[in-house]
Structures are given as structure tokens and as C-alpha cells.
Amino acid sequence: NMLVSDYFHKEFHVPYDSIAVIAGPCHAEEIALERLSYLTVGCSSIDHAKQFAKKLGNSFIKTSVSDDVVGIEYGSVLKNIYAIAAGICSGLKYGDNFQAVLMSNAAIEMNRFLNVVHPIERTINDSVYMGDLLVTGYSKFSRNRVFGSMIGKGYSVKNAQIEMEMIAEGYYAAKCIKEINEHYRINTPIIDAVYNILYEGISPVIEIKLLTDSFK
């Protein structure tokens, strides 16, 4: 349960200002098609972030920089869990209206989590957080959404993983974040619901119904 930046720093003694992360609404499938996409480069050294961003940018990839490495890393993990939740709801035949409510509450929950584990000033509506959350939750290219949809349709976790032949990172992320949150005790009902469905074997129908009663 260690962030990638922390792992490289602790295990290989790489200075934090030499570690950069990239995130944003940027599916590889659309990059291959040269469709306009946006990336944020996160590094504790903004100068280094700008250097990396300059090398990554081109006519169809717009780049920006941030020093919120921890927030970006956690956001990139959390959005996969929320995408599984979105997929589960889709598999259960909830419509677009509820999907919008789910993602709105996911953004609130993500912001709450980030503000506790790494309390700095950030704008959750920036594309590196909100944009990545939305594209992962809605896109047909999202492995995590597809995985969640299969769970919502009644597949077991094992059968969904076998049939997908791809890794849905959110499955593993749900367990990691659940364990991390044992220390922080943050209110994360969506993450808890996904964890209960995937690891405790609780019915998706029951867990999502509980969420519908708590959302605004």
C-alpha cells in the first residue's frame, strides 16, 4: 500500500524532485488515434515538471504541471474504484441520471479523501482529477467500468477477470484504499460499497440500493 513515488524514493533512493507522475483524461486508445488529450505532469520540482511536460506535449497532447504528486497519485487510484462503481450501476440497469449523481458524489468523496491524506490547496475540478474521474467512469475504453458492468450483470469476480483478459486496477485498489483508510477513518461510502461487493461477496443490488438512499 505504497505510492509509486514513495516506493522509488524509499527502495531506490531516488530524490522526490526527480520523480514525476503523469495523469489526466488520456486513454491510450485515443492517443493512438491522435485525438486531442490533456496530461498533467506532477513533480515536487515545478521546473522539472515543466521540462517533462515540454517533452510530452505535441499537436494533440496538451500538457500542464502540478506539484501535487500525492494527490495526483491517489486520484489516479481512486478513479478506478469509482469507475467500477459506475460499471456496476450500468450492469444493474441504472440510467444516465443516476450515473451522473454517482459521479458527482464520487468527486465529493475523492476530494474528501485527498484533503485528509494530503491536505494542500487543490482544485478538484481540474482535469487531472475530475477529467480523469469522468473519462474513466464513462468511457467505453475503461477496463474498470467494463469490469464493474460485468459484476453488475451477475459475473463473479473470478469469471469477470478471466473473460476480460485485462487487468482492472480498481479491483486491487479497492482493497488497498480500504486498508489505508483504516488509519484515516474517512467517510467513503462508494469505496466501501465496491469493496463489500468485490471482497465480501455482498450483493451489488443491496450495496447500490444503500448508496441510492444516501445520495443527494
Could you describe each region identified by the protein language model?
Residues N1-E34, F52-K54:
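Rossmann-like NAD(P)(H) cofactor-binding subdomain of soluble oxidoreductases
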Residues F52-K54, F60, S64-V65, L78, ...:
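Catalytic, metal-anchored helix/loop core of enzyme active sites in primary metabolism
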Residues A32-K50, A86-V101:
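Short beta-strand and adjoining strand-loop segment in the mid-core
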Residues S104-V117:
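An active-site-proximal "capping" alpha-helix that borders the catalytic cofactor pocket
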Residues K79, A86-S90, N115-K216:
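NAD(P)-dependent Rossmann-like dehydrogenase/reductase catalytic/cofactor-binding core
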Residues P25-I31, S59-A83, I120-M130:
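Conserved Rossmann-fold dehydrogenase catalytic segment
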Residues N97-A107, M166:
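Active-site pocket-shaping loop/turn-to-helix segments
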Residues I22-P25, C43-S45, S66-D68, A86-I88, ...:
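Fold-independent oxyanion-binding glycine-rich loops
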